[in-house]
Amino acid sequence: MKDDKEKALSAALAQIERQFGKGSIMKLGDNTTMDVETISTGSLGLDIALGAGGLPMGRVVEIYGPESSGKTTLTLEVIAEAQRNGKVCAFIDAEHALDPVYAEKLGVNIDELLISQPDTGEQALEIVDMLTRSGAIDVIVVDSVAALTPKAEIEGDMGDSHMGLQARMLSQAMRKLTGNLKKSNTMLIFINQIRMKIGVMFGSPETTTGGNALKFYASVRLDIRRIGAVKNGDEIVGNETRVKVVKNKIAPPFKQAEFQILYGEGINNLGELIELGVKHEFVEKAGAWYSCNGERIGQGKANAAKYLDEHPEMAKDVDTKLRDMFLSKTVVAEDKSEVKEKEKA
């Protein structure tokens, strides 16, 4: 009886693969893509909080927060990191507000970055779908969901009511996009804004635009907030930023990271590296002096960060030690033939 069932299952699997292509159905243990490929966010603390070393490829990511909290800066850092790894990126600028000079300062190669400034929300999402189906794009950023205005709203009069139009448009787009994103291994990042619900007595009155579909389809949701100012004397030179991982399908959620975003420079990753290094004893601190591997690297955090900037191999060493300590990567399932050969050896 058991043999009959196995034969019937094998025949069904063979028919499914013939009809829908190889890999359309498989046993979960045979899946060689169990280990999710990630791209660093530019912040070591946030990579650790995400649990996988960065944002996942082939998934939908939502980054939301108040105005001037660092949403676009964070996505530009991801794009810069992706480009350094030879990946192709696109920026759908629905807000028509991307500053190429600032993007270049953050390390983005603007000569290679694809940019689109669509007229309507439908056009923006259609462009995203076409880029995804091409299989040639690795990272797409949509800035922002709130600016994805439905065509009917643009063509209508100013006082017209368009209840639920944007939510319906996004819900349909999500249904179309998620399968294609997985197949082409493309990361899609949506930047979103915060709105207030009226008449909320208990719980948070905050909500994001575009309905509930994006909340469900996103594998990672990040809540980014400005929590203070970075000062050099009396001059404000940046923001203290906190990011909460509100939803995470690839690792445990609800972790958070704090880092500095410096004006004109982006995430202060070297300062963060020193703080985490001291906390976990990869960098020694005696008074105001910082040392690494028995070598003094500077008096004060700013000088120590400058030293690491001039000695990238030392910064890389501390970064690697911290990542090895926190990020235990899932081992990719190997091809069975390779496993058998190893067992014989």
From Swiss-Prot:
Q: Which domain of life is it from?
A: Bacteria
| Protein location | Cytoplasm
InterPro entries per the record? AAA+_ATPase, DNA_recomb/repair_RecA, DNA_recomb/repair_RecA_CS, P-loop_NTPase, RecA-like_C, RecA-like_N, RecA_ATP-bd, RecA_C_sf
Question: Which keywords does UniProt give here?
Answer: ATP-binding, Cytoplasm, DNA damage, DNA recombination, DNA repair, DNA-binding, Nucleotide-binding, SOS response
One MF term from GO for this chain? damaged DNA binding
Q: Name one GO biological process term.
A: SOS response
Extract one GO cellular component term from the record: cytosol
Q: Which PROSITE patterns does this one have?
A: RECA_1, RECA_2, RECA_3
Q: Which residues bind ATP?
A: 65-72
**The keyword DNA repair appears for this protein:** yes
* Entry keyword Cytoplasm: yes
Instruction: State the function annotated in the UniProt record.
Output: Can catalyze the hydrolysis of ATP in the presence of single-stranded DNA, the ATP-dependent uptake of single-stranded DNA by duplex DNA, and the ATP-dependent hybridization of homologous single-stranded DNAs. It interacts with LexA causing its activation and leading to its autocatalytic cleavage.
Similarity section: Belongs to the RecA family.
Q: What is this protein called?
A: Protein RecA
Q: Upper lineage ranks?
A: Bacteria, Pseudomonadati, Pseudomonadota, Gammaproteobacteria, Alteromonadales
